[in-house]
Amino acid sequence: MTEGIDIKELKRRMDGAVSAFKSDIASLRTGRASANILDPVTIEAYGSRMPLNQVANITVPEPRMLSVSVWDKSMVSAVERGIRESNLGLNPIVDGQSLRIPLPELNEERRKSLVKVAHDYAEKSKVAIRHVRRDGMDGLKKAEKDGVIGQDEGRAQSERVQKMTDETISEIDRLLGEKEKEIMQV
């Protein structure tokens, strides 16, 4: 710990915001099938709501097809209902104890709407990063005021926090740009 604030803790929190952003955009559907598409789906199972991946195995047998193998045969209809009600625009086809989910082509309007959602996720992550920065700066001001660190040390640490913030936000922008290209690719 550097006197004043814990830079490593701030970095860990900023990295957490980046990880959350990666997870959010991974669930956005692009032209290719990905098991992450079904991450937001929850199923009414055994008296409570559960993530789909806790009641079934999700695979990608073809580029435009997902396969969901339900572990408990009695859950097949609940899984189908959960996928249909998830607002992902998917129509599963029941095939015994599994479901096949063909992924329709994305039209231009849907692609633009997905890009907008990705931008919303990015903004949410940037706000979280700025909150971490603010917490760090407040800690520095308090340490400076309490005489724990001098003005020069406070200035140096605040520049480090700002540089870390800028780099983390640049990483969010880079990931957003990649996802945008992936979504808009026909």
Curated annotation (Swiss-Prot):
> Which keywords does this Swiss-Prot/TrEMBL entry list?
Cytoplasm, Protein biosynthesis
Does this entry carry the keyword Repeat? no
Q: What family is this protein classified in?
A: Belongs to the RRF family.
The reply on keyword Protein biosynthesis is yes
Q: Which GO terms describe its biological process?
A: cytoplasmic translational termination
Pfam families per the record? RRF
Enumerate the subcellular locations listed in this protein's record, separating them with semicolons. Cytoplasm
PANTHER family registered for this protein in UniProt: MITOCHONDRIAL RIBOSOME RECYCLING FACTOR PSEUDO 1 (PTHR20982:SF3), RIBOSOME RECYCLING FACTOR (PTHR20982)
Q: Which domain of life is it from?
A: Bacteria
| Gene Ontology cellular component terms for the protein in this record | cytosol
* CDD domains, per database record: RRF
Output the NCBIfam families linked to this UniProt entry. frr
Protein function:
Responsible for the release of ribosomes from messenger RNA at the termination of protein biosynthesis. May increase the efficiency of translation by recycling ribosomes from one round of translation to another.
One example of the protein's molecular function in GO is:
ribosomal large subunit binding
**What gene codes for this chain?**
frr
Species name = Rhizobium leguminosarum bv. trifolii (strain WSM2304)
UniProt name for this protein: Ribosome-recycling factor
